[in-house]
């Protein structure tokens, strides 16, 4: 409770109507004074209570009797029976709804659309022919012909002792078939050139080979006439292995 003047309130320090803070001044939203929507106030509430507590008058009773005579008279019964409404299911059957409101019609149309779509998909699947090329674009023969050896096989064999074995077959065709089994390590490779077993790449870039060669099978091949030098002839000259390189 606020203090009164007798209790020690200062004069002029009371609440001043219409001097509340605005939202900009720091008033919280919803903290303002709430006004009633109805302007009547207590007077309207009192009038409603008077209408509810008022007794039924004679005029009200006369109006009720007149309504009873109109609704329950025998003439109205006969007229009502003659023009009796049809049963609800018959009325519903007679009055047809438009297609936009008839749910059975919509469901039937949806089923028809689904069936048509399924038929179209089946026709498309029957008409579609999967075109598969008979052969791949790059065949084994093309790869062999690009390396310059017709019917030759170049196999790289990685052995544990890192030795290089040159085994020659004695099949004399238009080209000499040579099976080269070799391994290339970091010690055998020229650091200035990157050795790649691609088409014509190993013919253009020579590589350094260790002096140790297995000549057990290549001695018989030295007596055979050769029409074309093998790709392994591109070996740099060493003082210790010149004679061995001549037999390859």
Swiss-Prot record:
Biased composition (Basic and acidic residues): 37-71
Entry superkingdom: Eukaryota
Record's compositionally biased regions (Basic residues): 12-21
GO biological process terms on file: negative regulation of transcription by RNA polymerase II
Quaternary structure, from the entry: Binds as a dimer or higher oligomer.
Biased composition, class Low complexity, residue ranges: 72-100, 111-127
Start-end of each Sequence repeat: 8-12, 14-18, 26-30
Record key words, sorted: DNA-binding, Repeat
Keyword Lipid metabolism among record annotations: no
Any single GO CC term annotated in Swiss-Prot or TrEMBL for this entry: nucleus
Organism: Saccharomyces cerevisiae (strain ATCC 204508 / S288c) (Baker's yeast)
Misc: Present with 4700 molecules/cell in log phase SD medium.
UniProt-annotated stretches for the region Disordered: 1-127, 219-248
UniProt DNA-binding region: 1-36
Primary role: DNA-binding protein that recognizes oligo(A).oligo(T) tracts (A.T DNA). Can bind to any 11 bp sequence in which 10 bases conform to an uninterrupted oligo(A).oligo(T) tract.
Annotated region described as 3 X 5 AA repeats of G-R-K-P-G, given as residue ranges: 8-30
GO molecular function: minor groove of adenine-thymine-rich DNA binding
Name of the protein in question: Oligo(A)/oligo(T)-binding protein
